[in-house]
């Protein structure tokens, strides 16, 4: 079972409040969860609506896992210190740079913690060789330097129209993770909120308070998570930038939710979610925003210049809850195994009554084709290209992935997965 960190942070906030969370939110609220950890930045949006006389939380959008976080900040501070040492005539090797990065992390935490009155922290870079102690390099990192590098570099004041920039990349690069090219967290946030402007439009029972002509989805409440945001300076900058966007767009300022646990929220929230899965507590709902279909080729004689017609078979209905599975489709289909094949997926926010097994031969503009998926399914001793009779069953995971299983008559299964989360930054 997987659970996204922002959602886990919100579960922790609910659990820690002992029921008082209802006093901090109201119908029509949109909660923005900003999770800034050591290696990633994540955004989520949760709407507050009324259902049968009670408040209900409904997740309406999830951002990508942006590889940008506290580690980037530590490297940036280490670069500042290295430049100071190089101006003094010192050159650092890779081992010393690694030690410097660790020292910069510790200095950052000291200088930016709540209630800290420290203005500078000494930095010691160990030497290598026989003079390990006497040959160490010494300098300091000041609070002013940390705030300048982190606040202006990672949380710049930008307009809501700002977008992450992408530099021209070299033709060859080392294999590695797809790190964010733009370090501006506020630019990533602006892009996320702009893409989600319609995220609450089809949410039954939600009363939006966004003004006419809004250019991005307006959060009304903020919840922070992650050790980086223990700094009041960084927290204040995010609130400042977001509320400036809201004011310019004609909306009220967002308020900060009280009672967040920035260190242990993910662990505690995950434990509380296990409690929720047993039918207790408060569940954050997150049904699919579309009905989903898979393409099925017609069996027909070959005709020169003519592709076989494709029908769309509904496998997951509109509003299907995450963490649940749909019943198997009644149709028996033939699955091609042992050779490269292509799955075609479609989504529809218009056809809300279709159920698993609904087959569409024509759909005009009601369906939108999603990214195609290529795969070679294991043949398990069968000849390549063999056709296996199967029925399909879909499920939606807790992290918004559509999982499609093809189940043979003897119980053998093949599985493919497609990310069907709402568009995000």
Predicted regions and their residues:
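Short, well-ordered loop/turn elements at secondary-structure boundaries
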Residues: 26-28, 37, 93, 117, ...
């Amino acid at each position: 079972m997987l659970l996204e960190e922002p959602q886990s942070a919100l579960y922790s906030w609910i659990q820690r409040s002992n029921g008082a969370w209802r006093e901090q939110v109201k119908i029509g609220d949109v909660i923005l969860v900003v999770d800034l950890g050591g290696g990633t930045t994540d955004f989520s949006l949760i709407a507050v609506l009324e259902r049968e006389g009670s408040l209900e939380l409904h997740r309406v959008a999830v951002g990508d896992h942006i590889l940008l976080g506290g580690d980037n900040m530590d490297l940036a501070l280490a670069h500042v210190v290295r430049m100071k040492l190089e101006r003094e005539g010192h050159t650092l090797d890779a081992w010393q740079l690694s030690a410097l990065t660790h020292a910069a992390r510790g200095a950052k935490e000291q200088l930016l913690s709540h209630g800290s009155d420290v203005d500078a922290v000494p930095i010691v870079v160990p030497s290598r060789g026989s003079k390990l102690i006497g040959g160490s390099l010494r300098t300091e990192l000041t609070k002013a330097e940390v705030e300048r590098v982190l606040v202006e570099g990672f949380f710049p004041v930008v307009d809501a129209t700002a977008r992450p920039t992408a530099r021209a990349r070299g033709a060859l690069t080392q294999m590695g993770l797809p790190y964010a090219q733009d370090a501006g967290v506020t630019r990533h946030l602006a892009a996320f909120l702009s893409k989600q402007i319609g995220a609450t439009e089809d949410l039954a029972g939600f009363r939006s308070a966004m003004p006419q002509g809004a250019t991005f989805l307006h959060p009304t409440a903020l919840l922070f998570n992650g050790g980086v945001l223990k700094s009041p300076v960084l927290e204040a900058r995010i609130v400042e930038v977001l509320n400036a966007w809201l004011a310019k767009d004609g909306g009220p300022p967002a308020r900060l939710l009280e009672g967040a646990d920035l260190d242990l929220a993910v662990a505690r929230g995950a434990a509380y979610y296990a409690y929720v899965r047993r039918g207790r507590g408060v569940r954050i709902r997150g049904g699919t925003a579309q009905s989903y279909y898979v393409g099925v080729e017609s069996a027909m004689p070959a005709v020169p210049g003519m592709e076989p017609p494709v029908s769309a078979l509904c496998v997951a209905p509109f509003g299907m809850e995450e963490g649940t599975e749909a019943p198997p489709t009644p149709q028996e289909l033939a699955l091609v195994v042992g050779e490269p094949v292509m799955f075609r997926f479609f989504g529809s926010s218009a056809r809300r009554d279709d159920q698993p097994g609904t087959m569409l031969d024509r759909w005009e503009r009601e369906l939108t084709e999603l990214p195609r998926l290529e795969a070679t399914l294991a043949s398990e001793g069968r000849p390549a290209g063999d056709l296996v009779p199967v029925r399909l069953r879909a499920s939606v995971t807790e992290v918004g992935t559509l999982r499609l299983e093809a189940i043979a008559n003897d119980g053998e299964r093949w599985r493919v997965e497609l990310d069907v989360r709402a568009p995000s930054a």
